[in-house]
């Protein structure tokens, strides 16, 4: 079975609650339609082409590169970000009283084609989909959330909460994307070996940010320079790093509670840890109303079941809620909110037909809406588990 064989097989449409109309207002609202582009690159291309400062563009979230997606963004009304290029189009649709942001995203509607489904397996997928529509699925954060974790499993934010600021800066400056070129990998390895020798590192710093960070450490040796360098990180980067670590701890808390149940379990392999799921209908009852807080300095103010589970996870890591209070110079903070333990797909449809690209196979088509913050990829991975063999991650230890 294949998902995302072509971008058209994975369509995402963002839904927002930002009030807007056609009458002129403070902010111009746009749709961004893209295929095989990531969100940031698409908006930046439009900004360069129109001469609009990148800093005035606001949007709700990043959408998958390997997909066909529609989402929203804003600029101040004085600008016009209209833009079209191969596989990307920015179109003005009206005006809004406030800029677009993550808080305005209600969720996303997904339309997904699963190809090369063996004959007979489509019925299993359909049965599993019906179960998920009735009972929901555990609402773990999926692997996309953990882009800030290194190959060793270390999190930037964990260094920060442990007050190892040199380790945090080292993580940021020496980590690289899994698809980075061999030249970048070699340069990052050299930076890691020379860490602390700021004069040597100056010759390896090639981006403006790297040069500025090394400059801080040269001008102010010791912790002061390192704190100044960390203060150069953008709010977006801080947000990604902090939410990544919080989400990993949240997943651990939910997994801890699931493993303590009496239900039979199976598991999915995650980038950070193994994620246990109920084999049958364990998401019924109290699980449907369970809220688990994100780890933060506010945790100690609650004593519900979810808070206790997060507290136990923090204790296992040798951390306390007050560790999540950050140095003011970072201009960043850990968000404090609760997340549902179970997500139920809405507006679902399921269909099965002959695969027009793979003779002798079926294709499944599933459409559904998920609230903001929930992961269609996790729903699809769980759906695949109904198929025996390589397409399933298989049962894991309970």
Stretch-by-stretch model annotation:
Residues 1-22, 27, 35-36, 49-50, ...:
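Extended, charged/glycine-rich binding lobes that contact polyanionic ligands
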Residues 39-45, 376, 380:
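Ser/Thr-Pro-rich, acidic low-complexity intrinsically disordered regions of eukaryotic RNA-binding
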